[in-house]
Amino acid sequence: MNILLANPRGFCAGVDRAISIVELALEIHGAPIYVRHEVVHNRFVVDGLKAKGAVFVEELDEVPDGAIVIFSAHGVSQEVRQEAKRRGLKVFDATCPLVTKVHMQVARASKKGTKAILIGHEGHPEVIGTMGQYDNQDAGIFLVESVEDIAKLPVSSQDDLTFMTQTTLSIDDTSDVIEALKEKYPAIQGPRKNDICYATTNRQQAVRELAKQSQLVLVVGSKNSSNSNRLAELASRMGVPSKLIDGPQDIDPSWLDGVETIGITAGASAPEVLVQSVVEHLKTLGVTGVSNLEGCEENMVFEVPKELRIHEVK
């Protein structure tokens, strides 16, 4: 029995940046540092930051006056930003720059009075933050999750209409929704390239290749990680059993019955240390070889805020 590791896998530039912001803030200012929402959707990462003194909250009313707060990689609404400013909280923004790009698209649409349609998952913090950039009551922003949702849209005119997408969606599903939107609203405008981020795209492409050569695909990632869930779904759609696991403790040995090659990947918020712990555990269950799938190299780096960067250089 062998293991085939997907490439690329694991941390993306936005996740690296977000974790660095929390760690540097703790190093410079000391604990506690408050973080609004899980900075990234991975239990192992969050538990590690908690141990260093990060305090995770869901709303700013849980943050004491005058404290330091970090916004998660998923981004926040303008209302949250205004509340932080009103209360005089010291803010470090860990919003992924690729999410910020979508925020700017929404803000421009709001300012111009253009109706906006966001393709995304209802209730996901990125979606909540993105929709919260729109405040034009004379137009409006609407959420669709699927092709079926398009028929329910309360939008009759295609004039001054634009769309954008959550950054961690299924490429295939999103393409279907965009095609259906353009069919219903031929004049709808959108980004030249969809907003699904490079890391999501690369990891989904790697899973396609992984599934072709595996009888089981294990995706290392937490249950609340959107991009990790999409990886597991994609492998399943290709006819290969897939499991989303937080770590080796989640592996059921019965999954390995009749399996010759186990494909392993990791969501963009899952650290490589977890992947290696899964590999080592599988070796105790009969794995004898480990190889890497060829894939694209990622060199993207996002800088931390200047105040933290100066300290980092020192």
From Swiss-Prot:
Pathway where it operates: Isoprenoid biosynthesis; dimethylallyl diphosphate biosynthesis; dimethylallyl diphosphate from (2E)-4-hydroxy-3-methylbutenyl diphosphate: step 1/1; Isoprenoid biosynthesis; isopentenyl diphosphate biosynthesis via DXP pathway; isopentenyl diphosphate from 1-deoxy-D-xylulose 5-phosphate: step 6/6
Classification lineage: Bacteria, Pseudomonadati, Pseudomonadota, Gammaproteobacteria, Pasteurellales
Name of the featured protein: 4-hydroxy-3-methylbut-2-enyl diphosphate reductase
Residues given in the record as (2E)-4-hydroxy-3-methylbut-2-enyl diphosphate binding sites: H41, H74, H124, T167, S225, S226, N227, S269
Gene Ontology biological process terms, A to Z: dimethylallyl diphosphate biosynthetic process; isopentenyl diphosphate biosynthetic process, methylerythritol 4-phosphate pathway; terpenoid biosynthetic process
Cofactor binding comment, as recorded: Binds 1 [4Fe-4S] cluster per subunit.
Pfam families attached to this UniProt entry: LYTB
Cofactor: [4Fe-4S] cluster
The species this protein was found in: Actinobacillus pleuropneumoniae serotype 5b (strain L20)
Positions that bind dimethylallyl diphosphate: H41, H74, H124, S225, S226, N227, S269
Keywords: 4Fe-4S, Iron, Iron-sulfur, Isoprene biosynthesis, Metal-binding, Oxidoreductase
